[in-house]
Amino acid sequence: FSDKEMAMAVEYLEYLGTDQFSANELQLELFKLGLNYDVYAASERVYITLSGLDESIENGIQLFEHIISNVQPNEIALKNTVLDKLKEREDAKLSKRSILYGGLLNYGMYGENSPIKHKFSKEELINLNPDSLVWKIKKLSSYDHYVYYYGRKDIEEIKTLLNKYHQTPENLKPIIPAK
């Protein structure tokens, strides 16, 4: 990913609460609404998906905007996320498939610009600052982005909801290109 910190921040997000809700309370609120969200960092973009019941879309947009705007750092959650990432790397070293397709193939295709080389070192992971990662999350809406809607509601109703709840600056930043 073009921004290593952003990629780590979106992994960390699911373990964070806000100024009003703990991480568990957020999951419970989403469950009550029949909604789920997922955030994933791909090569050049961050994908955010809010899915579930159409009748809960307004509350879901409000809640997700609250999460992004009011997320709070959690040192323990970051330490656990880092430990998970380090364990994942150790496990990958034991997998021939991961070595061949995740490492050698990528290096063969991209050389020095291989995604395998554009990752945090162990020391960098351990020294990540939770406040810096939370700041990245809070700035997600300030980058160029698209909103896609699939559902039964009228598109004008969705536009109205987004205009009402989706807070963005007047001028959006360009997406950071992948290396």
Regions found by a protein language model. Name each.
Residues 69-70, 74-75, 155-156:
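Short beta-strands and strand-coil junctions in structured, solvent-facing domains, enriched
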Residues 38-40, 73-80, 172-175:
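Surface-exposed patches in mature extracellular/periplasmic domains of secreted proteins
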Residues 1-14, 18-70, 82-90, 95-124, ...:
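M16 family metallopeptidases and their MPP-like homologs
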